[in-house]
C-alpha cells in the first residue's frame, strides 16, 4: 500500500499546461478507493480562488485517507496542496505532506518558471535543495486542472498527450493515449467518457506500463469518474463518489 495514494492523485492529475478556465472556485470532487474487494479509503479535491504573490491563483487541496479495515492495519493521512497560476496554468507553490504506515514525507516546493528552476524544502529536517527543471513542469495537482482545461480537439481517439510531472526531487515523463469513447456507469447514472491509458512506470508500483485505465467525462469538465490500476500486488479502483460546484453540467442519464 506504500505510496499508492500518492499515485492515485497522480493518475487523477497527469496532463500538460494551459490557461485554467474550466474550473469554478468552490468545486469539490470526492473519490472512493477500493483495494481489491476492500473499501480502502477516500480522496477529496477542493478548489478555491486566492491571490498569491499579487496574482490570481487556484488553491487546490487534495486529502487522502484510508478507511475501514484497511485503516486498521495501514493508516494513511495525506495532504497535498498546489497554488496554480490561473493565467498560465503553472504551479507556483506545492505541498506534499503524507503519512502512510511508516512512510513519512513533508515537502514544500517553490517554482520559478522564468528560469526553469525550483526550490524543494524538506520540512522534516528543514533542509532545502535547488533543482533545474524544464519548461512547463507540473506538480501532481496542477496537472489535473490543466487536463480539464485542454481543448476537446486534443482528446481525439488515437491522440497522445505527453507531459512531465515533478514528484519530490525528480521529474517523471508520462504519456496519455486516448483509446476510445465509452459510456460509463456510475452511482449517479451513465455518462459518456473518454477512455484513456496513461503509460506509467512499471516495476515499482504497477505491473506494466499499460496497467492503468482511466475514464474522464467527454465534455468541457473532463472530470475523472473512474480509475483502475493493476498493481504488483492486487488491484486498485477509484470511483467518483461526490461532486459539487462543477462549472459545466454533468449529463448523467438514469
Residue spans for each PLM region:
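Acidic, serine/threonine-rich low-complexity disordered tracts
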Residues: 19-113, 152-254
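N-terminal signal peptide c-region/cleavage motif recognized by signal peptidases
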Residues: 13-15
Amino acid at each position: 500500500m506504500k505510496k499508492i495514494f500518492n499515485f492515485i492523485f497522480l493518475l487523477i492529475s497527469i496532463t500538460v499546461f494551459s490557461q485554467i478556465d474550466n474550473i469554478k472556485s468552490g468545486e469539490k470532487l470526492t473519490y472512493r478507493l477500493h483495494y481489491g474487494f476492500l473499501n480502502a479509503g477516500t480522496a477529496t479535491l477542493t478548489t478555491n480562488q486566492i491571490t498569491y504573490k499579487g496574482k490570481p491563483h487556484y488553491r487546490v487541496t487534495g486529502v487522502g485517507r484510508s478507511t475501514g479495515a484497511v485503516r486498521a492495519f495501514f493508516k494513511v493521512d495525506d495532504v497535498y496542496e498546489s497554488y496554480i497560476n490561473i493565467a498560465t496554468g503553472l504551479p507556483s507553490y506545492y505541498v506534499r505532506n503524507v503519512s502512510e504506515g511508516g512512510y513519512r514525507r513533508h515537502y514544500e516546493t517553490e517554482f520559478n518558471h522564468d528560469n526553469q528552476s525550483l526550490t524543494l524544502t524538506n520540512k522534516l529536517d528543514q533542509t532545502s535543495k535547488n533543482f533545474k527543471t524544464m519548461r512547463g513542469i507540473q506538480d501532481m495537482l496542477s496537472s489535473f486542472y490543466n487536463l480539464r482545461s485542454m481543448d476537446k480537439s486534443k482528446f481525439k481517439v488515437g491522440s497522445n498527450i505527453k507531459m512531465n510531472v515533478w514528484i519530490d526531487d525528480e521529474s517523471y515523463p508520462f504519456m496519455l493515449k486516448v483509446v476510445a469513447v465509452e459510456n460509463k456507469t456510475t452511482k449517479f447514472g451513465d455518462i459518456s467518457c473518454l477512455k484513456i491509458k496513461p503509460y506509467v512506470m512499471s516495476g515499482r508500483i504497477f505491473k506494466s506500463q499499460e496497467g492503468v485505465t482511466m475514464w474522464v467525462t467527454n465534455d468541457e469538465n473532463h472530470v475523472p469518474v473512474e480509475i483502475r490500476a493493476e498493481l504488483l500486488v492486487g488491484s486498485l479502483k477509484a470511483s467518483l463518489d461526490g461532486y459539487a460546484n462543477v462549472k459545466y453540467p454533468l449529463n448523467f442519464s438514469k
